[in-house]
Regions:
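Membrane-proximal helix-turn-helix segments that form the acceptor-binding/catalytic region
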Residues: 130-152
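Carbohydrate-associated surface elements
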Residues: 158, 177
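Acidic anion/phosphate-binding donor-loop and adjacent secondary structure
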Residues: 178-194
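Nucleotide-activated donor-binding/catalytic signature segment of Leloir-type glycosyltransferases, i.e.
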Residues: 239-257
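Short alpha-helical donor nucleotide-sugar binding micro-motif in glycosyltransferases
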Residues: 261-266
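Aromatic "clamp/platform" in nucleotide-sugar-dependent glycosyltransferases that forms part
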Residues: 274
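Short hydrophobic beta-strand element within catalytic cores of glycosyltransferases
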Residues: 291-294
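A charged, aromatic-enriched C-terminal amphipathic alpha-helix characteristic of glycosyltransferases
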Residues: 318, 332-366
Length: 368
């Protein structure tokens, strides 16, 4: 190992952190926060380590796909080991790429959920092979060993319970950091004018159409409420059925700067996820004062623990009547619900997720 090097933090993650996504958003916050505190940051991922052939495996070639999941962790870990020096204060990994042995350095594994929990939640919607891979290979082998002999971190009490149940690790709940000055209440009328929205109620969905996100609920609410303008901000392709709905306006790959405008233009946001460790889009919407109608998952269970907020929580993703009832409830008095969110949720969210508070908690847990 080299000596007399400046303090650095290594981040080990499956792909580039510049992409859209909750895990990537978290790592962008963390990398920027380390740099602001005087640390150098190096990010090791599948596209800057290892042979090009293994960077984008063909999911239709099952053996290649399976091997790539293991080899990403090997090449990422090997590159990190070769770069280690005496100034590396922490190696922070996540997902399935933190299992490579790195001796003599402090390590932490951040669990953004578990693949085991995700596999169980979406089992009816994926092939048996995919379920078995998620449950046994990704979760019980790669993810479990990625957390072994590290400081285990996670984003909610729900996920802490999963980690202990499946892996036997006692994780620290540290939530996520969130820029609450960026995601703040804005003038609804101005936001709607920017988006050129018609008069009338506005709903919102931000996310993807993967099986975990419960997108059919969004389609159904839009179809049953033609008077409602439904904003749908998604990553990736849209299902064909959505194009036939005249009251749906789609925004693909919405940028970070646009998100507060979207949240503040809406009377409510929908989060019907089957599995969500702690959804950034829920926290972002709530930080803007926007009520989120949600199935039970990490973020909704965290913030909707007291009256009248439980009225925004459905029994499950499949509780369509619960979503209908909550939509009617919010639209009957949208300003009242905004006031409830700003009074009861935003102060707690600030305490948990404001960057200065989050960093104090994180630094204490990992010993920096």
């Amino acid at each position: 190992m080299r000596i007399n090097q400046p303090d650095e933090v290594f981040i080990l993650t499956p792909g580039p952190i510049e992409r859209l996504g909750g895990m990537e958003r978290f790592l962008q916050y963390v990398a920027r926060g380390f740099e602001q505190r005087g640390f150098g940051v190096r990010v090791f991922h599948s596209e800057n380590t290892g042979p090009r052939f293994w960077r984008h495996p063909n999911s239709k070639r099952k053996l290649e796909w399976l091997l790539a999941g293991s080899l990403h962790g090997y090449y990422i870990g090997r590159a990190a080991r070769e770069a280690l020096h005496s100034g590396v204060r922490l190696v922070l990994s996540n997902s399935t790429v933190g299992w490579y042995p790195l001796n003599g350095v402090k390590r932490a594994q951040y669990f953004h959920g578990t693949y085991r929990g995700q596999a169980e939640a979406i089992r009816p919607f994926i092939k048996h092979q995919g379920y078995m891979k998620l449950k046994w290979w990704d979760a019980m082998v790669l993810e479990r060993f990625s957390g072994k002999n590290t400081i285990a971190l996670c984003c909610s009490e729900t996920i802490r319970a999963e980690i202990y149940r499946y892996f036997g690790y006692d994780a620290h709940v540290i939530w996520y950091p969130l820029d609450i000055d960026h995601f703040r209440p804005l003038d609804m009328k101005s936001c709607r004018e920017k988006l050129k929205l018609n008069a009338g109620p506005v709903g919102l969905f931000v996310g993807s159409i993967s099986p975990t996100k419960g997108f059919p609920v969004v389609e159904q609410i839009a179809r049953e409420n033609p008077q409602l303008t439904m904003l749908v901000a998604v990553r990736g392709p849209l299902p064909e059925g959505i194009h036939s709905l005249q009251n749906v306006r789609t925004i693909q790959d919405a940028g970070y700067e646009l998100l507060p405008t979207l949240y503040n233009a809406a009377d409510f946001s929908l989060s019907p996820s089957r599995y969500d460790a702690f959804s950034f889009v829920v926290a972002e919407a709530l930080s803007c004062g926007t009520p989120v109608i949600a199935s039970p998952h990490g973020a909704s269970l965290t913030f909707y623990a007291e009256p009248p907020l439980e009225q925004l929580l459905t029994a499950s993703t499949d509780d369509v009547e619960g979503f209908r009832r909550a939509v009617r409830n919010v639209l009957s008095n949208p300003q009242r619900w905004r006031a409830v969110i700003e009074e009861k949720v935003r102060p707690r969210l600030k305490q948990m997720m404001a960057p200065e508070n989050w960093w104090r908690r994180f630094a204490g847990v990992v010993g920096l």
